[in-house]
Amino acid sequence: VILNGGRAVHYPCRAQDGFLPDPDAVEALITPRTRALVVINPNNPTGAVYPRELLARLAAIAARHRLVLMSDEIYDGILYDEAPFEPIAALAQDTVCLSFGGLSKVHRACGWRVGWMSLSGAVERAADYLHGLVLLAALRLCSNVPGQWAIVPALTGPDTISALTRPGGLCLVETQVVP
């Protein structure tokens, strides 16, 4: 955002609200200069998982204001108390939606720089954006080839994170100790 001359405007996710954003407060922050709405779900560091109704409202806000919806879903497999996760892209057919994922969190491959982005929704409105992404990829990005080879085994191999997040799992136990 800053590299392109923009300014990030943050919306609050307060403890008293279960670390969930208030859609009305989010919409109140939108100005004519707003270009995108960023959603981080499941949230880090709180672990909050946004319910379907909240995601639908955020997607509707993005569509109403013709914003690009950017969804950081890197923690989609780290869910406590069997919280259901739903990708916002499934609810965002009327807007351009970029969803981001990767190996670093769920597959504990931090630092490998192996991730992906998927584009969905009103992709016909994203031609200029896609051109910019292709240009950026050609000029700036350098692939982590060994990490790319790890993608298929990581995604198809044994689940190593649920033992930490299910009831009695170390991560769940430790999160309950934090006040």
Region spans (language model):
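PLP-dependent aminotransferase-like
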Residues: V1-V39, V49-R52, V152-P179
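Active-site pre-lysine segment of PLP-dependent enzymes
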Residues: I2, V9-Y11, F19-R33, P45-V68, ...
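Aromatic "clamp/platform" in nucleotide-sugar-dependent glycosyltransferases that forms part
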Residues: P42
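Acidic-residue sensor for enzyme active/binding pockets
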Residues: E73, Q148, E174
